[in-house]
Amino acid sequence: MKTVTVKDLVIGTGAPKIIVSLMAKDIARVKSEALAYREADFDILEWRVDHFADLSNVESVMAAAKILRETMPEKPLLFTFRSAKEGGEQAISTEAYIALNRAAIDSGLVDMIDLELFTGDDQVKETVAYAHAHDVKVVMSNHDFHKTPEAEEIIARLRKMQSFDADIPKIALMPQSTNDVLTLLAATLEMQEQYADRPIITMSMAKTGVISRLAGEVFGSAATFGAVKKASAPGQISVNDLRTVLTILHQA
């Protein structure tokens, strides 16, 4: 299986990489949060742009991205607008969503974008090609904050992302039971062993699913999300605790 290298970070080998999400409403908060995050132990900075209030002003959005890039130049920057239908803070049209991601790609400030699988097949394929033409990696994602589908469906979604040439397919699901967590882990393992030719990221959310955020190296998930301050999804634990557990499992 091939790995994905962003800056000096190799994703898909060794212990799962830690992603943290920065969620700030304006430029001032982006700046202060960035300074606080700079001291934390993580691998990839995700900027959750759906929390940013001044979305209609692309210049303002890119000014914020520039602050993040300049504050943490060594960290890979993942640009993510999480749609309202997949748990995000704001609802925008598909056209606006694609335009925002293209603006991020054009800016030269971001290393990766998050592109939701169910945005529309043609738009997704075109945006992946556009990102790759500008040397930007694509994390293709799907989130369900209500349920966990059958393993076959989880695998089908991850394989579809791979067929659309996502650099890293990602899925996050809400368990209704511990069995749902096992379903997610079994699907991850089957995908990783039988179909994946690139790194994947999977997680089961909430307290019930915490084990999935810790055991990625065992089952085949290449990265996990931790919290510096406020968690961006239910079930995230602090980056310091997360790094400790990931290191213990890696060295065992």
Swiss-Prot record:
SUPFAM superfamilies per the UniProt record, alphabetical: Aldolase (SSF51569)
UniProt enzyme class: lyase
EC number: 4.2.1.10
Top-rank taxon: Bacteria
Recorded catalytic activity of this chain's protein: 3-dehydroquinate = 3-dehydroshikimate + H2O
GO BP terms, alphabetized: 3,4-dihydroxybenzoate biosynthetic process; amino acid biosynthetic process; aromatic amino acid family biosynthetic process; chorismate biosynthetic process
Keyword entries, A-Z: Amino-acid biosynthesis, Aromatic amino acid biosynthesis, Lyase, Schiff base
Keyword Protein transport included in the entry's annotation: no
Alphabetical list of InterPro entries matching this protein: 3-dehydroquinate_DH_AS (IPR018508), Aldolase_TIM (IPR013785), DHquinase_I (IPR001381), Type-I_3-dehydroquinase (IPR050146)
Pfam families, per the entry: DHquinase_I
Active-site residues, record numbering mapped to chain: H143, K170
GO MF annotations in UniProt: 3-dehydroquinate dehydratase activity
Gene3D superfamilies to which the protein is assigned, alphabetical: Aldolase class I (3.20.20.70)
Binding sites annotated in the UniProt record for 3-dehydroquinate: S21, E46, W47, R48, R82, R213, S232, Q236
Pathway(s) annotated for this protein in UniProt: Metabolic intermediate biosynthesis; chorismate biosynthesis; chorismate from D-erythrose 4-phosphate and phosphoenolpyruvate: step 3/7
Keyword Lyase attached: yes
Subunit structure, interactors included: Homodimer.
Function: Involved in the third step of the chorismate pathway, which leads to the biosynthesis of aromatic amino acids. Catalyzes the cis-dehydration of 3-dehydroquinate (DHQ) and introduces the first double bond of the aromatic ring to yield 3-dehydroshikimate.
Similarity remark: Belongs to the type-I 3-dehydroquinase family.
The name this protein goes by in its record: 3-dehydroquinate dehydratase
